[in-house]
Amino acid sequence: FGGKTTIFIEPLALALSKKSGGRPVKIVMSRAEVLRATGPTASASMDVKIGMTKDGYLTSGSVEFRMQGGAFGGSPVSEALQCAFASYNMPAVHHIGYDILANRPRAAAYRAPGSPMAAFAVESLIDEICTDLSLDPIDVRLKNAVKEGDKSSYGPKFKKIGLIETLEATKNHPNYSVSLEVNQGRGVAAGYWMNHGGETSVSVSLAEDGSVNVTVGTPDIGGSRASIALMTAETYGIPYDSVSVNIAETGALGFNEPTHGSRATLASGKAVYEAANQTISEMCRRVARKWQIDPDAVFWEDGYAKPAGPNAGDFSPISIKQIASEMDKTGGPIAGHHEASIRGVGHSFGVHIADVEVDPETGRVTVLRYLVVQDAGRAIHPSYVEGQFQGGAVQGIGWALNEEYVYGADGCLQNAAFLDYRIPVASDLPNIDTIIVEVPNPDHPFGVRGVGETGIAPPLPALANAVAAATKVRLRSLPMSPAKVLKAIKTGSDGC
């Protein structure tokens, strides 16, 4: 996940193509080669200190993160530092990060790079302090949650954000009050990702039948085509099925950053809104000429150009279909194009609850119940949003319990196959319950926040906190494999 966002082996294809006189080149890698060479996320070791009063107010925090970037550097340590204390309003914070070089594959992007590791360290320690002080973990987070106007731990002030609403929805969910049995535990954790915008180009054009064609440069890997169509339809006030969204080839549109950083719906949606409004303005101008009135006296509503009040004249509204059918007579094709460097971020917060059962004889962790609560800003396509929530949670569960690169004494990867690198399957998982919280993003015309990455940050600490509650032993390293959990139960520590 994420390896597609960086140039890796493509230069070899270019070199081979040039050497062969411009012939096309196809490079095929085996599964083992992909796992060995294309780059995992960075491994990390972390030191965290947190000050908290007896009644649960955070006073200070300090982190030192060491992240292994592979042989060439480039670990997500800066992103980890941004995310570490982003959920909390602390009077004093201190961040130090190191990008460590090692004889390993270069680290690659992996869903919310750096955030899951930071969340594991910080949220585990907050939970440990809450346990020592007999404080409710959600109440403590509510006391310290960042809100509009607070300065983030990494500098900028937050605009409207939904962490408090997310925590309240989590506390009110039935999962937080379900009774637990012996060897069972419940863990809570928050997570953050900053969803950037970036360089974006889109084109919008009107067809003769009144339908709208949208061309974007962000490949659809998580439902963005549908959400962009919905935002386009809402901008024009036309049915969803009147919009067609096309993904352009690289050379067919202006520059676009890849689909990464939870930016597709956030950035392309904002650009489509601007391009669509260009065409709406043009349609209003043409209708104004037809009515022989000032363009300012025409406004757009629900797919129609209408006179702006009785003083503009007694004219019947003209539909987008009629305007489109007359384009050849009123000035030719109607199209809009918008290129933008979209600054600012969406600030997405999530809170997860995990209930687990630990087998004291084998150390196996079974996830009994799992809840994802996240602020989506505005959920343009709710079922796709829920899918992103669930996908992030499942990836995080795999990271917390199973997934690990195992290197031998010779420095070679020992488990370069899915038989040995074990990802979660359906039988490993409960139903992932979701709650969509909607606190609109003030920097987006539809209130959108990117939702693709935040969901992978809370599972690591939520499960670690649940295992600690079930076993009364705190594990400080991942994954929490059966062997590691069993050792911790027997010795009282995982050795970290």
Task: Show where each model-derived region lies.
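C-terminal structured "cap/appendage" subdomains that terminate the fold
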Residues: 445-464
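Generic long, charged, amphipathic alpha-helical segments
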Residues: 244-246, 424-449
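N-terminal amphipathic, basic-rich helices that act as targeting or association modules
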Residues: 134, 141, 347, 352-415, ...
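Short small-residue beta-strand/loop micro-motif enriched in glycine and branched aliphatics
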Residues: 211-215, 377-382, 442-446
